[in-house]
């Protein structure tokens, strides 16, 4: 599923929104994302509606087959007063790399408004390539937020064989996690179980990488 452009929106007047996508691709193709939101597209239930997004990256052997991928200024999954739940599983095969479960970058954001909680769950791709992150937030003040509710982030690094650098949760340069009301932040990460180096549970690093609770 691809949503692109400022006028591209999935909205409701108060009901829940459920979006499920599975990436395709074959051979050495890459960038086969399950749910792909870019160029200021939005998923936005109104009222007390909840947003439930699930994505599975495609299984081709090219790079970057994310389960759920948001990128670009104004690209959002948000709510008015409901919960936002995003679950992604990275794809890829063979030596494919950078198959994140959930990837938020380049000023995109995921976050519940009002009293809603934000829950992100990601599983990195099971390949022999590197950098299969469970949850990856990076670049241009990309954000995971909650206005008054809690933020829950759970990531499992992927990889197999000699694969490495498979972080469970990677909050990198200008990646921000911000509970800006009364909510709490819970982050749980497990590094990949492959035999390569640097399979870290939770990584926070790079200029501007931030985890902030105003409570």
Give the location of each predicted region:
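Surface-exposed loop/turn motifs in large extracellular/passenger domains
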Residues: 1-215
């Amino acid at each position: 599923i691809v949503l692109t452009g400022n006028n591209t929106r999935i909205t409701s007047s108060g009901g829940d929104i459920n979006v499920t996508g599975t990436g395709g691709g074959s051979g050495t193709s890459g960038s086969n994302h399950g749910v792909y939101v870019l160029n200021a597209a939005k998923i936005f239930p109104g009222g007390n509606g909840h947003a439930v997004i699930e994505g599975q990256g495609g299984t081709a052997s090219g790079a970057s087959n994310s389960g759920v991928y948001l990128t670009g200024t104004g690209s959002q999954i948000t709510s008015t007063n409901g919960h936002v739940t995003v679950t992604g599983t990275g794809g890829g095969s063979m030596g494919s790399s950078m198959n994140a479960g959930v990837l938020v970058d380049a000023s995109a954001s995921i976050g519940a408004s009002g009293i809603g909680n934000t829950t992100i769950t990601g599983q990195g791709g099971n390949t022999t390539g590197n950098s299969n992150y469970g949850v990856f937030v990076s670049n241009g003040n990309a954000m995971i937020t909650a206005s008054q509710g809690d933020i829950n982030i759970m990531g499992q690094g992927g990889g197999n064989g000699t694969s490495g650098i498979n972080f469970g949760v990677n909050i990198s340069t200008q990646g921000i996690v911000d509970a800006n009301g009364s909510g709490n932040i819970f982050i749980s990460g497990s590094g990949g179980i492959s035999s390569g180096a640097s399979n870290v549970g939770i990584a926070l690093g790079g200029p501007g990488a931030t985890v902030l609770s105003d409570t």
